[in-house]
Amino acid sequence: MTTRREGRELALQALYSKDLVLQDANTTLKRITESFSEGEEPTLSVNSKAYAFASELVNGVVSNLQAIDSRIAEKSKHWSMARMARVDLNILRLAVFELLYRPDIPKNVTMNEAIEVAKKFGADDSASFVNGILDEIASTVTDKE
């Protein structure tokens, strides 16, 4: 697994946990990585670069949540955000953050990573759902945004 993929997965877990327990996402991210380090999940280790990338993603999503959610709501024509699975919504939030605020990451990389994370953490139809909405959003993002 690449460092950035690991970072995206950690960020997803932190944002998802934040939604469930209404706790600060950075605190959740720290707890997730500490539990791995303490051996609760001995097969997982947290790379410091992955943690830094996850932290950047979490902070970016939280800081820009209104703009990100607005884009998602605008392009998810037949789905209210309240109806979306929390995992799918947070995968979308992470990817939309990358599309809007990380022009150094190619759009196709962001989309592919989101789809792969959706396959791993989401339901059977999550990958196609995420792909459909991200495709709509990506088509409206200019390189200057």
Curated annotation (Swiss-Prot):
GO terms for biological process: DNA-templated transcription termination; transcription antitermination. Keywords: RNA-binding, Transcription, Transcription antitermination, Transcription regulation. Gene3D superfamilies: NusB-like. GO terms for molecular function: RNA binding. Pfam families: NusB. One of its GO terms (cellular component) is cytosol. InterPro entries: NusB-like_sf, NusB_fam, NusB_RsmB_TIM44. Involved in transcription antitermination. Required for transcription of ribosomal RNA (rRNA) genes. Binds specifically to the boxA antiterminator sequence of the ribosomal RNA (rrn) operons. HAMAP family: NusB. Belongs to the NusB family. This is Transcription antitermination protein NusB. It comes from Citrifermentans bemidjiense (strain ATCC BAA-1014 / DSM 16622 / JCM 12645 / Bem).
